[in-house]
């Protein structure tokens, strides 16, 4: 005795979609156990269907639980076996299922993953719904439910309608651990399923839609590289002469253009520019030189420690040269000094003040002149002694 099942063309073979956790853990172990249990249940259902078919038409209790129809049991076994085979390392397109089957395949937040018995029952219910729809010639009660299940995946509906069957995509098709099914809520079992694209073109469109693969433009990379070289290495690969400098500081070109007329080598100089105005540089330098508006005179290098002594710029210049310039005395001054020296070679304090007032010389100058005059006279006397 043989049994055959004719499925309606718009009903696709129901499969189960499992999502593997990248990190492993309890969820992955539980799913592996459930898949093994589903495979065992599928094998038991197939054996029961074969025994019932070979025993003269008496159905097995497992087949009777599926509705007493051998074709339904065989379809359930085939569906469970296909689910067990396609779940590992594959992500297949979920078929539109009945409400009961859909609730069996998906787990709500806070609930444990479906067990092996629940998976087998869901597969049997889906096969029974498919058989009922095919025998009645219409969508049956599962038609609206299938439409609602198909509406749940609105982003991928176009890709699902363009295919005639489930297209399996390998694990890691879109990259390292990328899943097009987003997790809803903090619970690891709260999963929102989404249909997979069925062809290569649809897969590419799906990746373009849900993955941001567009990188920065080549111009942006080149401009960033030029800016990096300009500010950190000092080489300008283009006319970067209108950039905005940092507030309070300026960039001065220290070397003329090396690569061409529109290129220059810049080295940032930390100079405050509160009171600076730009001056154009000659010789075609691509830049500006900043000079202070008001050139303040530098302070004198030497200042007297005495409060009554006032330093002059001429004195400062003389001290910078190391020796004050010799000022020759006038004939009137020399005549007055020689007259007083002839009277007395050593000058007194009162005479020094009087000579200083008469000759318009300082007392120190008068004293030094008398000292030098005595030394000169001594030299002349010594020379006369040596010659005679």
UniProtKB/Swiss-Prot annotation:
Question: Known consequence of changing residue 372 to H?
Answer: In HFG; severe
DNA-binding as a keyword? yes
For this entry, the protein name equals: Homeobox protein Hox-A13
Would you identify the family this protein belongs to, as annotated? Answer: Belongs to the Abd-B homeobox family.
Q: Tell me, which GO biological process terms does this entry list?
A: artery morphogenesis; branching involved in prostate gland morphogenesis; embryonic forelimb morphogenesis; embryonic hindgut morphogenesis; endothelial cell fate specification; endothelial cell morphogenesis; inner ear development; male genitalia development
Q: Disease linkage in the record?
A: Hand-foot-genital syndrome: A disorder characterized by limb and genitourinary anomalies. Clinical features include small feet with unusually short great toes and abnormal thumbs. Females with the disorder have duplication of the genital tract.
Alphabetical GO CC annotations of the entry are:
chromatin; chromosome; intermediate filament cytoskeleton; nucleoplasm
Q: Which residues bind DNA?
A: 322-381
This chain's function reads: Sequence-specific, AT-rich binding transcription factor which is part of a developmental regulatory system that provides cells with specific positional identities on the anterior-posterior axis.
PANTHER family recorded for this chain?
A: HOMEOBOX PROTEIN HOX-A13, SEGMENTATION PROTEIN FUSHI TARAZU-LIKE PROTEIN
Entry's localization field? Nucleus
- Subunit (UniProt): Binds DNA as a homodimer. Interacts with MEIS1, MEIS2 and MEIS3.
Alphabetized Gene3D superfamilies for the sequence:
Homeodomain-like (1.10.10.60)
Keyword Magnesium among UniProt keywords: no
* InterPro entries registered for this protein in UniProt: AP_axis_regulatory_Homeobox, HD, Homeobox_CS, Homeodomain-like_sf, HoxA13_N
The UniProt keywords, alphabetically, are: Developmental protein, Disease variant, DNA-binding, Homeobox, Nucleus, Transcription, Transcription regulation
Q: Which GO terms describe its molecular function?
A: DNA binding; DNA-binding transcription activator activity, RNA polymerase II-specific; DNA-binding transcription factor activity, RNA polymerase II-specific; RNA polymerase II cis-regulatory region sequence-specific DNA binding; sequence-specific DNA binding; sequence-specific double-stranded DNA binding
What Pfam families does this protein's entry cite?
A: Homeodomain, HoxA13_N
